[in-house]
């Protein structure tokens, strides 16, 4: 499989774009080599500039739950664009989106549209601080909530130390308000609240962690967070940018039957276009301007073309049996790869929730936290990744990113993927 045109484009891109990409993970630093440049998508397939075809399990990092260029989504976008690309004023379409989200997401009484997941989480944090009058937030190691200053923070040297920045350019005074503990460790959360509880505005958590690959909550974890927030008057924020409409129609909160105070959304809700949203309890959301004193605004918020793409997608995923089929296809894929890894005598485990999955090259039976994920055999993943790419299978170019199945993936696509995996894993074991 040649990538001459991709390589040429990457060299050209580096002359005018930092690192040649507009988001770091696209640069292939996690797997080595140079990125693939794509030109079009159709259903479960992507086509690169060298006319290679791939079965796609990235799906634009999650949004394309109905596959590439679904005719109903494309038609909705074309119709909306013909009426105008944006007005910077209210439209009926954004009302329909708000009504749909409040009907489908258990926690949402009111919702505000934004243009990205980072905007959504940043705004939800500000709102939680404004509502509680507190400054500190608690997040979990390995969970990614966008690139806002208060969220690019890691734990200090001990469980009770204040946070430190993970990027230059973030003031220590900002990072110190962010406390970080291990995902799925309720004991650490309780210890932090024992010391700082009256100062903590919010816990922000992914119901299923998707940036340490795919790590679901252990039984009782989300329920425990709900109880702790209730006990201390803190706001529970579910970051469902990734899990929203991906693991279930009502997101992770419906799947696990735990209702947060605020929810952030993105990805699927935009149908492939740049959209984010945050919403929740009426009492909290009424703190947002123009009703309340907590300021938030956006020139492109509620863009009519993006709303049309999102609404068309949300209509499709409400079809009877949609999520049952998505989960079955994902399970076929994951179980098939695990079986072929066993046949090749290569240690591997996997996690799957709905149409979201993660593969881990490890002898451990279960991956439940970031430390375990980082201790997996990363070099083996790199070899597996490039082997699958050569066979026309496109996974995320990082061992710490979840994979996604769409409704466009049929049995033929799964079978072709498993055939490629069998060959690649056999070669890795030789």
From Swiss-Prot:
It catalyses: (S)-4-amino-5-oxopentanoate = 5-aminolevulinate. Signal peptide: none annotated. Its cofactor is pyridoxal 5'-phosphate. Keywords: Cytoplasm, Isomerase, Porphyrin biosynthesis, Pyridoxal phosphate. GO terms for cellular component: cytoplasm. Its main location: cytoplasm. The modification N6-(pyridoxal phosphate)lysine is found at residue 267. It comes from the Bacteria. Its EC number is 5.4.3.8. GO terms for molecular function: glutamate-1-semialdehyde 2,1-aminomutase activity; pyridoxal phosphate binding; transaminase activity. GO terms for biological process: protoporphyrinogen IX biosynthetic process. It is an enzyme of class 5 (isomerase). CDD domains: OAT_like. Pathway: Porphyrin-containing compound metabolism; protoporphyrin-IX biosynthesis; 5-aminolevulinate from L-glutamyl-tRNA(Glu): step 2/2. It is found in: Cytoplasm. Belongs to the class-III pyridoxal-phosphate-dependent aminotransferase family. HemL subfamily. Homodimer. This is Glutamate-1-semialdehyde 2,1-aminomutase. The lineage of its organism: Bacteria, Pseudomonadati, Pseudomonadota, Gammaproteobacteria, Chromatiales.
